[in-house]
């Protein structure tokens, strides 16, 4: 429901707010699957999806914190540019009315901002990719665990989880659509308002934390996945480690597990998820 509402939002922060509700639903779906698996004696799978849900909370926090900060930077600069144009313009009653009616959070007043705010645009792209679950970026690793293990529970007798399993699969494509739409409306294409020419990148006090959060968003999820974050968060491991493998061996293991699981049913689920989130959703935007 939250993902569907995000489809039609023009307020950049409302898109992110409804996205947060949608991602929380992912987390709770994972916790529900974990509970069923624990109750049926499948403790290993239950622990993994429980750890995956907690891992997704971390990945989502990194990405969404950065996205809200980046969107705030965009809103501030758009508002500042509009004020600049207002003070340069005439002082008529109509001008005052249009000034007060202007919404700096409305993406319909943006467009083409990537050339004006390259750091912010890059940060929001990486954050959006993490929320979408683009392969190898942040949230992909935890979302893959939640979707895979929820379908695993259904395939092993949890008929009540068919609805949630279908919904989180469909939501993967919906997330790809509304997050791509947000980025394209804000940063791509031709400017839809003359104020865009007066927009510039934020100060280093904003850019620096954006860069730090972008690195954590892009690489943090991957790095933690390689070092066994899911097993650690599920209490299956006492600490983060490479489990006796070299770094390259562990990277290959995680990539194979994500893209080529032994269970063919889960392999198809994973490929459909990637198709919906990475290709169909963004193309439709």
Model-derived features: positions:
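Hydrophobic transmembrane alpha-helices and their helix-loop junctions in integral membrane proteins
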Residues: 1-202, 216-223
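Hydrophobic membrane-spanning alpha-helices of multi-pass integral membrane proteins
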Residues: 24, 127, 206-220, 241-257
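Membrane-interfacial helical/loop segments at transmembrane boundaries in membrane proteins
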Residues: 145-156, 227-264
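Glycine- and aromatic-enriched alpha-helical transmembrane segments of multi-pass membrane proteins
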Residues: 207-225, 259-285
């Amino acid at each position: 429901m939250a993902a569907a509402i995000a489809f039609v939002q023009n307020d950049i922060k409302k898109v992110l707010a409804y996205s947060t509700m949608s991602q929380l639903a992912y987390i709770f779906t994972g916790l529900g699957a974990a509970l069923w698996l624990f109750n049926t004696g499948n403790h290993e799978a239950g622990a993994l999806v429980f750890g995956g849900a907690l891992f997704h909370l971390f990945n989502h926090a990194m990405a969404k914190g950065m996205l809200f900060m980046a969107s705030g930077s965009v809103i501030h600069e758009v508002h500042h540019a509009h004020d600049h144009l207002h003070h340069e313009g005439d002082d008529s009653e109509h001008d005052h009315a249009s000034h007060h009616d202007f919404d700096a959070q409305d993406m319909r007043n943006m467009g083409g901002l990537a050339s004006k705010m390259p750091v912010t645009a890059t940060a929001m792209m990486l954050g959006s990719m993490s929320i979408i679950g683009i392969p190898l970026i942040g949230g992909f690793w935890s979302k893959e665990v939640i979707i895979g293990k929820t379908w695993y529970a259904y395939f092993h007798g949890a008929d009540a989880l068919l609805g949630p399993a279908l919904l989180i699969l469909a939501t993967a494509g919906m997330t790809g659509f509304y997050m791509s739409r947000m980025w394209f409306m804000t940063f791509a294409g031709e400017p839809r308002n003359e104020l865009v020419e007066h927009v510039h990148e934020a100060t280093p006090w904003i850019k620096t934390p954006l860069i730090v959060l972008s690195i954590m968003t892009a690489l943090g999820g991957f790095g933690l996945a390689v070092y066994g974050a899911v097993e650690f968060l599920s209490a299956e491991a006492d600490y983060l480690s490479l489990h006796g493998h070299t770094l390259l061996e562990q990277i290959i293991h995680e990539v194979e597990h994500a893209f080529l699981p032994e269970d063919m049913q889960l392999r198809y689920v994973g490929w459909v998820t990637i198709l919906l989130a990475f290709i169909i959703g963004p193309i439709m935007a």
